[in-house]
Amino acid sequence: MNAKRVAVALAAIACAPLAAQAQLAKVTLYGSLNLDVEWVTGATCASAVPPPANNNCSGSDPASQISNPTVMRVSSNSSRFGLRGSEYLGAGQVAIFQLESSVQADTGNSSSSGLASRETFVGLQGDWGTFKAGKFLTPYDDILPLFGNAPTLTTSILSTAAVWAQGPLPKSLGGFDARLGNSLRYETPPLNGFTAELQFSTRDSSGNANGGDNGDHASETRHASVWSVGAFYSNGPLDLGLAYEYNRQMRTADQNDHALSIAAAYDIGSLFGSPGLRLGGVYERLNYGTLAGSLTRDFWALSATVPIAGGSLYAMWGRASNGKGDAPDGTGVGFVVKGPDTGCDQWEISYSYPLSLRTLLYAGYVRINNRANAAYTFNINDYSIVNGARPSGTVFGITHFF
């Protein structure tokens, strides 16, 4: 046997274990493209007067405000692609991973947040539960599907996280619905319908200060961190959820925030042999520590999902209270401001219709009725407005999953 044949034989032997492992590994390319055409209205800021971080160009000068007529735009709504996979390790243990990136499907531009800008992690799974490390949403976000429109797959300005959890805002501005890097998460296996989730995100100096996505690496010196925990029950027609999140010095030094959400949903259609008619509700309390004192806000919402003509009709009403606490009037964190007329109501109705298992059409209308001193706006593809504006939007969209 010549040297070349020996080398080939040795290479084949060396690669054999890798080939065997590859046969046990499963890797899937997946994603979704969600595009819609929108008509949005609302009083917005003059171009010469840029809005501050909370999307509110305040001030009594009328020159800083424009009454904006209807604006037509095409938007990409959480479009994404990714790779996910698993490898069986033996003895019931599985290695799991996922790498997911945002896609600007309306312009074709790459995401400014980087390649792994969405749910990205590696971990282990077994009959003891699931552990993973990376970047992902917190257990607090898992409350949203109980009352929100996430199950109808109509993610857009129709997002029901516009007011709940200050959804449009990152941690550095007081949001509680952010995707967090530098995270460790454990999920229990289901036990008689019960599950629990615990996540810790460290914001210590593992990156450039005050940079990154969603407030990532908020400070190199103050050791900011996030704890998020959730407990859930799902059995038959009933779903319950309780979540709590504590943000330590995420906005600035010596100021801590925390939030509590309780949600429930019940498929009342199952009582009549026609499942799918689902009612949901949520209560939330946000608490912010400020230099001037405490600031709190309550939020309630009720929703209904009704199966109609092969699709799903979804309706929701939510109300944010005025900002309260011992901080003086005018104290604000994000959209939450202490004082009278700082609350809002959010109304929404939408209909989604599946053309197939992977393609969905949807249409809807959303409106946020801000009181005189409030400036809440849409969650996804937000729209900068002035205090007291009532932003609204009509959408027609299509989503394809692959």
Language model region names:
Residues 37-45, 103-109, 139-143, 204-208, ...:
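Gram-negative outer-membrane beta-barrel proteins
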Residues 77-81, 118-124, 180-184, 225-229, ...:
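Hydrophobic, lipid-facing positions within transmembrane beta-strands of outer-membrane proteins
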Residues 222-224, 228-354, 365-367:
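Detector for outer-membrane/organellar transmembrane beta-barrel domains
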Residues 1-22:
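Gram-negative bacterial Sec-dependent N-terminal signal peptides
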Residues 24-39, 63-203, 232-236, 370:
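Outer membrane beta-barrel
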Residues 386-402:
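Outer-membrane beta-barrel "beta-signal"
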Residues 66-70, 171, 213-217, 250, ...:
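Extracellular loop and loop/strand-boundary signature of outer-membrane beta-barrel proteins
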Residues 27-35, 91, 95-99, 131, ...:
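Transmembrane beta-strands of outer-membrane beta-barrel proteins
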